[in-house]
Amino acid sequence: MKFHIGKDGEVKIILVYKNAEKVEEANDLYSYLKEKELFKGDLGEVYSHISHSEDKFILLGIGEKEKTTANSLRKAFFNAGKELMKFKVTSIKISIPMFKNLKYESIVQSITEGLLQSEYSFEKYLTKKKISPSIKNVYLDILEEKKEETINTINESKNLIEGIFLARNLVNEPAIYMTPTVLANNAKNQLESLGVEVKIYGKEKIKELGMEAFLAVSKGSFEESQLIVMNYKGNSNSDKKLALVGKGLTYDSGGYSIKPTSSMINMHSDMAGSASVIGAMKAIAMSKLEVNVVAIVAACENMISGGAYKPGDIISSMSGKTIEILNTDAEGRLTLADALWYAVDVVKADKIIDIATLTGACVTALGSINTGAITNNSYLMDNVKKASECAGEPVWEFPNNDEYKELIKGTFGDLKNSSGREAGAITAGMFLQEFVGNTPWVHLDVAGTAYLSSKNGYLQKGATGVPVKTLYYLAKGFKNK
């Protein structure tokens, strides 16, 4: 899909508010449809006037006027893209509208992203493919003085989509093919050509670093664990670094605290945190952001074998802190503990964001709408929230009262890796906080938002790419301060 500035295009998209009095460009048809209750202008509603007409257009509902947001525009244009594919439309034209509550840049970005998101599908293993993308050219009728801004916004949106689609593809890949080594090679292949330095460390180096918690989780698998370190240097005049740490469980059986079959089926998605940081790094590098970002992924599988770690074990970590294993299915926090300490002790990051499909408790609390968050720094949290709002990927902050720390204190080790059912999403985050020292840090629990069991707006079933956009906008605003 290519975007152009101009008024060409085979089919025009006409925007309609819910229950609008009239539609200038198609009022007779709209009045008829409204009277017959065939089209009301609900958000994402589409009426096609394409098949038997020289004046080809679609009516696209954008909902109630006062409720128009960047995200609602994404949803509407996603639906428009899907509808146009059914008719194999190859080119479209859109007059960029103005909304009092939205910046022009945000409007263009939302329209662009909505259309691009409509092209995504994961059909690699289907012998019969579904409807293929057909829109080759999109013509945008814009204000002349906004031309440069529009072109820049389109390019940035396309870079973001590249990162999002990469993340989605990595997560949707079944675990039989997406092993830790394959994940590492994907990071290398996708990022090195963009100027990102990618280093991959195997078991011996991981052991040398003292990452015993990470290694403990991987002991039950035949697949070798991989530490993936991606370094993007966008500002040579600064030594400030933002670290993105992604959970990289390419498959999680639960270990000896084994999951039921129904809970295992989608556990190839337990590396969504790692996929999001790889995707974000791609978008950051493609856009040449003037910022220094280091992404870290501790990739492994959590499996069962004679050598696997067990409930009741006490293990050490790169930080030196010891951990009692009460539940082998609380493994992500163990791999992250060492990856976070690597960000602190080796990378010496100035700010850290970790992203993980960490707890079912977060899904219970927030469902698939909001990403859960916990922090040790309110200023950084505010920046994450602003980035998430810009991205249309809402974040909800959990409390971090010191009293919760009592729930993760160990009896025979410094910490325990599970606090039971009580405040599970919070205590998991508090556990991670033990491995960041005084470095400003935010934990994002994407257990409910990174992978969907059913369609939600412009996000289809399966991997969503959340929170690639949030990480990108956070990095964009970081500016090495």
Swiss-Prot record:
Active site: 259, 333
Cofactor: how bound: Binds 2 manganese ions per subunit.
Annotated residues for binding of Mn(2+) 1: 252, 329, 331
Localization (cell): Cytoplasm
UniProt-recorded Gene Ontology molecular function terms: manganese ion binding; metalloaminopeptidase activity
InterPro entries: Leucine_aapep/pepB, Macro_dom-like, Peptidase_M17_C, Peptidase_M17_leu_NH2_pept, Peptidase_M17_N
HAMAP family documented for this protein: Cytosol_peptidase_M17
Function: Presumably involved in the processing and regular turnover of intracellular proteins. Catalyzes the removal of unsubstituted N-terminal amino acids from various peptides.
Listed name of the protein: Probable cytosol aminopeptidase
This protein's encoding gene: pepA
